[in-house]
Amino acid sequence: KQFTKCELSQVLKDMDGYGGIALP
């Protein structure tokens, strides 16, 4: 599945658990 940057940042935050990964 393709994600927009907005969706991707939310997914990464969920996976990271701390929101330590941020996309522009």
UniProtKB/Swiss-Prot annotation:
Q: According to its UniProt record, in which tissues is this protein expressed? A: Mammary gland specific. Secreted in milk.
Q: Would you kindly state one Gene Ontology biological process term found in this protein's UniProt entry?
A: lactose biosynthetic process
Domain of life of the source: Eukaryota
The record's subcellular locations are: Secreted
Cellular component GO terms held in the UniProt record = extracellular region
User: Which key words tag this protein in UniProt?
Assistant: Calcium, Glycoprotein, Lactose biosynthesis, Milk protein, Secreted
Per the record, the major location class is: secreted
- What is known about its processing and modification? Glycosylated (50% of the proteins).
The question of whether Calcium is a record keyword is answered with: yes
**What the protein does?**
Regulatory subunit of lactose synthase, changes the substrate specificity of galactosyltransferase in the mammary gland making glucose a good acceptor substrate for this enzyme. This enables LS to synthesize lactose, the major carbohydrate component of milk. In other tissues, galactosyltransferase transfers galactose onto the N-acetylglucosamine of the oligosaccharide chains in glycoproteins.
Family (UniProt): Belongs to the glycosyl hydrolase 22 family.
Q: How does it assemble?
A: Lactose synthase (LS) is a heterodimer of a catalytic component, beta1,4-galactosyltransferase (beta4Gal-T1) and a regulatory component, alpha-lactalbumin (LA).
What is the name listed in the Swiss-Prot or TrEMBL entry for this protein? Answer: Alpha-lactalbumin
From what organism does this protein derive? Felis catus
Q: Which gene encodes it?
A: LALBA
